[in-house]
Amino acid sequence: VGETTPQYTDFQDDGKYSWLKSPTFYGKPMQVGPLSRVLCMLAAGHEPTKKYATAALDLVSSVAGAKVGLDAMHSTIGRHAARAVGCAVQCDELAKQWDLLVANMARGDLKTFNRPEFPKGEQRGVGFHEAPRGVLSHWVVIDSGKIKNYQCVVPTTWNAAPRNENDQPGAYEASLIGNPVADPEKPLEVLRTVHSFDPCLACAVHVVDQENKPVVTVSAV
């Protein structure tokens, strides 16, 4: 767990400051999202993922007239293909979840949420979730039922991370290394590659007061 210390003063043409954090897993930057999910599920022997990933690669192989293996997934179009594979797997799972929901309702279980109960005093928690763009994590400090501190590390934080203190590039930068560009004046290949991660601009937007004064106050009734 690190601490974010903003260094921004004003806009500078020569500056290379990024508002994004540089999260690491065991000291290394990570790519998150559909491709990561598909590769991890294949490594875990998940049969539905294997079924649809194999079908996708077989289809591409027939169109290309040559065998296209799993290594081809590490590419711009591979990330889009992984997104389609993931959607197919999730559609099958959704049908199963729907049947389970209907069965629960038939037994009289109509609950839609669990009402939260917070003990008195300071409580700390963290939650991880696999969102469509990739892994999403939230950290929170709650004091007597009120949020005292909150931080998110979202999928785009991982993928768009700038180089860290060990000079390790984030996923965007790493994916662009060696990427051919037909026209340097119109580097559409760069745009296409970054778009394949489905970037979220809001994930790098923050409102900060340099003197640590409250920026906005919200009253919840």
What is the predicted role of each segment?
Residues 1-221:
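Metal/cofactor-centered catalytic core regions of large enzymes
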